[in-house]
């Protein structure tokens, strides 16, 4: 077997593993729960699995092979811009039917990928197994989002719980790392990288320091107990308006117990570890916290420069809000479709770097840019401080 073939076998196995994870999540839930919309920004769990199977089939059959027999009637259900979130529950198949349908189209797709006809191999999307990487990463991102849905479901169904430990506040340590002085290359040219990670370009530091660790639960509690949610001067104008509207006073999954706090997760209630990264805060809260701590959020390039120098610790617990908006790199070219990144370069989306406990290896890389609007709290997001 040639090296290239080995790569392909591994990628096919990865795709199959992603699909199995999705099936497992659906398979162990009560029948009714897969069609519930638990949060206005999230889709029903059943929709996610159907969408992943649809997207896989759409790219392989409709785009590469020009055969729309399976997908033609499903565009209005599974293309996000053709079916608003609130309408999705009514389209979710019954659990067994969903498992059977997604299982069947997925097996057919795997067989096609394992032994593609000659004209399929020539397609530009098949070069360097691009489409396989793309589909694996697509599944990986939806699987993470399915965990956000599971956490919202816990918020809905779980009763009172007694934490095993008391969370006590701690002042932010502010252990700072010096950002590299010399220019650092930002982005990734690997074939698997998304359009928004390219092209690579040099960045020279502006600020000087970035925190070694993300902000912790204990530090965030200090902000709360110091009336961080009530001090207007810590908030930007839009941030304050957002707060006034939502009346938020703690991270999204935190719950108050008699003498302390705990948090809900995709796997149920759990203690808030004092040194674990705080999760479930939006950009505005991250911004207010950093002002309270006498710091600021890092620009995404500061974050990436520090991550490339191997400096950052505590990675992979939460997505970390960056100071800047999501924007195209100089020389950006959209691929494999206009809609992946371009619509979100709208000055309303912030950038998140790093990755959470639910982020799977195919999308865990230093150059990966996640993006959400500034008010989102259902994602597993926290922050890391920076200083000039
Ligand atoms: C990059 C996570 C914001 O969920 O909308 C999934 C990823 N794009 N299917 C999203 C995505 C198309 C995207 N995020
Ligand atoms: Fe998608």
Name each model feature, range by range.
Residues 56, 304, 328-329:
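Hydrophobic positions within alpha-helical membrane elements
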Residues 197-201, 227-248, 314-388:
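Surface-exposed recognition segments
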Residues 189, 302-303, 321-326:
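Histidine- and/or cysteine-centered catalytic micro-motif in compact active-site loops
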Residues 2-13, 17-29, 33-37, 41-45, ...:
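Extended beta-strand/loop cores of jelly-roll/beta-sandwich
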Residues 306-315:
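Cytochrome P450 C-terminal beta-domain/meander region
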Residues 300-305, 367:
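Short, structured beta-strand/loop micro-motifs enriched in basic residues and often containing a Trp
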Residues 62, 310-311, 331:
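Single-residue recognition of alpha-helix boundary sites
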């Amino acid at each position: 077997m040639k090296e290239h073939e080995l790569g392909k076998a591994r990628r096919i196995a990865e795709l199959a593993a992603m699909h199995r994870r999705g099936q497992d999540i659906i398979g162990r839930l009560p029948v009714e729960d897969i069609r519930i919309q638990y949060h206005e920004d999230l889709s029903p769990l059943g929709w996610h699995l159907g969408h992943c199977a649809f997207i896989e089939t759409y790219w392989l059959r409709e785009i590469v092979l020009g055969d729309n027999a399976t997908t033609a009637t499903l565009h209005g259900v599974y293309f996000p811009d053709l079916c608003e979130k609130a309408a999705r529950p009514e389209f979710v198949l019954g659990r067994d039917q969903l498992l059977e349908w997604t299982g069947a189209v997925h097996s057919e797709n795997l067989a096609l990928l394992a032994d593609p006809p000659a004209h399929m191999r020539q397609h530009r999307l098949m070069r360097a197994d691009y489409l396989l990487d793309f589909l694996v990463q697509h599944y990986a991102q939806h699987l993470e989002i399915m965990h956000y849905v599971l956490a919202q479901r816990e918020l809905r169904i779980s009763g009172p719980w007694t934490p095993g430990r008391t969370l006590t506040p701690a002042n932010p340590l502010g252990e700072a790392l010096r950002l590299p002085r010399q220019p650092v290359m930002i982005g990734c040219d690997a074939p698997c990288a998304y359009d928004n990670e390219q092209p690579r370009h040099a960045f020279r530091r502006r600020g000087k320091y970035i925190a070694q660790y993300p902000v912790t639960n204990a530090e965030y509690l200090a902000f709360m107990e110091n009336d961080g949610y009530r001090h207007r001067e810590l908030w930007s104008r839009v941030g304050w308006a957002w707060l006034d509207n939502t009346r938020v006073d703690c991270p999204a999954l935190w719950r108050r117990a008699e003498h302390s706090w705990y948090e809900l997760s995709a796997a149920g209630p759990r203690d808030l570890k004092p040194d674990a990264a705080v999760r479930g805060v939006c950009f505005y809260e991250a911004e207010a916290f950093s002002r309270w701590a006498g710091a600021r959020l890092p620009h995404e390039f500061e974050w990436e420069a520090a991550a490339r120098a191997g400096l950052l610790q505590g990675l992979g617990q939460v997505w970390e809000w960056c100071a800047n908006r999501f924007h195209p790199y100089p020389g950006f070219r959209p691929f494999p479709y206009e809609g992946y990144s371009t619509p979100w370069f709208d000055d309303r989306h912030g950038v998140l770097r790093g990755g959470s406990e639910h982020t799977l290896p195919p999308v865990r890389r230093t150059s990966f840019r996640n993006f959400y609007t500034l008010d989102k709290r259902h994602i597993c997001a926290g922050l890391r401080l920076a200083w000039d």
